[in-house]
């Protein structure tokens, strides 16, 4: 009788705990949107780069432009801090900065700007059509806004995390606590491919 009772209690305990495979992230889990992570752009070294160039790494994607006065450099500085906090695990983490300003963000300009945050960060650029296509894939708003003889670019800002199998999984809006971003990256790094 006691044995049946214990088995029943164990069964109830296991059912109550459940086998909930849903993962909890600090950022927004956008995996259900099935966004296309693929790309083919030129990196700041002048080489063509695709998603496969960063195979088996967790990737943080940020869209911005080098003349951005505040949000872009702040986000890149946070990503630098995040990479440092990851320690050795940071070797399996890649930051990609996608330029939304194909007119001004040349290879030369990106090759000076991006490494000033971290030498492992990669700046990517392309033609207007290539950049627009990639921004559309990621649902990133961007618009050129004239300002006297120059212009700025209004854009949505956030960090997209791509898992090691190449799927866009998480989006952290601008201003998200870095501790949450670090925890999400660590969780993605711990997943089997």
Where would I find each of the regions flagged by the language model?
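Sec-dependent signal peptide recognition
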Residues: 2-8
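Short, internal strand/loop/helix patches
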Residues: 111-156
